[in-house]
Amino acid sequence: MKAAVVYYSRSGVTKKIAEKVRAKFNADMIFVEPEKAYKGFASSIIRVIREKKGKKTPAPKTPAADFSAYDIVFIGFPVWAATIPDFLQEYLRQADLSGKRVIPFATAGNNGKEESLAALKALLPDSEITDYFYTSMKEKADADAWLEGIRA
């Protein structure tokens, strides 16, 4: 079983979970970067709001990988404006994950659990999305327990 971890983390919270996934499944890591980096917390919020209002989808700097050799693809992201960051959505549109088992994990301040999962399902209709993990400041979840429950 070959696994990949595709993730973005501005603050390092999502990265910590990505590293746990890598260690447990001996997964390859793919850090997806936006063309223009998001800086501090407050400036990132302002920028995301402006991008949403202007309907500007920022492009990913990271080119879509070839996932043909992978059985499982973990996708990790922070929840921004109740969904997956736009540049990561664009990356996923470019990636061919058809027929792949996709296991998402999301970190959030306080909302977007259902919305981000719905967005992922809409982006990847031909993928099998399982074992969704979500943790937030309001809804704490144990990543180690989640990982132990995943059947590879």
Residue ranges and their predicted role:
Residues 1-75, 82-93, 142-152:
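N-terminal beta1-alpha1-beta2 submodule of the flavodoxin-like/Rossmannoid cofactor-binding fold
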Residues 2, 26, 99, 126-129:
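A generic structural signal for alpha->beta connector loops
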Residues 8, 78, 82, 107-110, ...:
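Short, surface-exposed acidic/glycine-rich loop or hinge patches that mediate macromolecular interfaces
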Residues 12, 76, 99, 109-112:
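Glycine-centered flexibility sites
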Residues 32-36, 55-60, 101-104, 119, ...:
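Short, surface-exposed, polar/charged, turn-prone segments marking secondary-structure boundaries
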Residues 67, 93-100, 122-124:
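Short, conserved loop/helix-junction motifs that constitute active-site signature segments
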Residues 75-76, 104:
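Redox-cofactor binding/interface segments in oxidoreductases and associated redox assembly factors
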Residues 103-142:
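Short, glycine-/small-residue-rich phosphate/pyrophosphate-handling segment
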